[in-house]
């Protein structure tokens, strides 16, 4: 199999959350990409998509959190505009467990792709709420409650018409 075929196999295992099989396939992909770069004497080596997925799998399959973070960070350094890389990094931090860093990673991913479904789902599962209407006041302040209910009722009315 080629490096690309191992990469696709690894990605398929990641989608199934079969971390051990994904890690094995992605390690083989990484190895073959490195061999390919050496043979071609080129500077391009392992694609950042592989690095990011490898980092996630290292954390999930073998609890190698620090190494997982490093791989995810390398992917982000190579290609900082990919929300998926921040999603993977956030999952690694959740495994750590470091909820604060996980949230920062997820929010950075949402800045790049506000409609990233997996990040949104993860934040929802974590119980993250939207900011209060008047963010300079506490969430339970009566003005925040009043305006929140007012906006929510107006939204429901406009959706029903």
How should each PLM-predicted stretch be described?
Residues 27-31, 94-135, 141-148:
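TPR/TPR-like (Sel1-like) alpha-helical repeat modules
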Residues 19-20, 27-85:
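Alpha-helical adaptor scaffolds
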Residues 1, 7, 15-20, 66-70, ...:
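Intrinsically disordered, low-complexity, charge-biased linker/tail regions
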Residues 11, 56-57, 91, 125:
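Residue-level recognition of tetratricopeptide repeat
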């Amino acid at each position: 199999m080629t490096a690309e075929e191992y990469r696709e196999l690894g990605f398929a295992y990641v989608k199934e959350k079969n971390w051990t099989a994904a890690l094995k396939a992605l390690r083989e992909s990484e190895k073959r990409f490195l061999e390919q770069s050496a043979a071609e004497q080129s500077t391009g080596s392992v694609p950042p998509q592989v690095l990011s997925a490898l980092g996630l799998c290292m954390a999930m399959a073998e609890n190698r959190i620090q190494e997982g973070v490093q791989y995810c960070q390398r992917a982000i350094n190579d290609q900082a505009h990919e929300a998926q890389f921040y999603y993977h990094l956030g999952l690694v931090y959740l495994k750590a467990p470091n909820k604060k860093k996980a949230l920062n990673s997820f929010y950075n991913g949402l800045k790049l792709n506000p409609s990233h479904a997996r990040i949104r789902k993860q934040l929802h599962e974590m119980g993250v709420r939207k900011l209060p209407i008047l963010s300079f006041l506490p969430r339970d302040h009566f003005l925040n409650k009043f305006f929140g209910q007012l906006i929510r009722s107006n939204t429901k009315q406009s959706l029903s018409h």
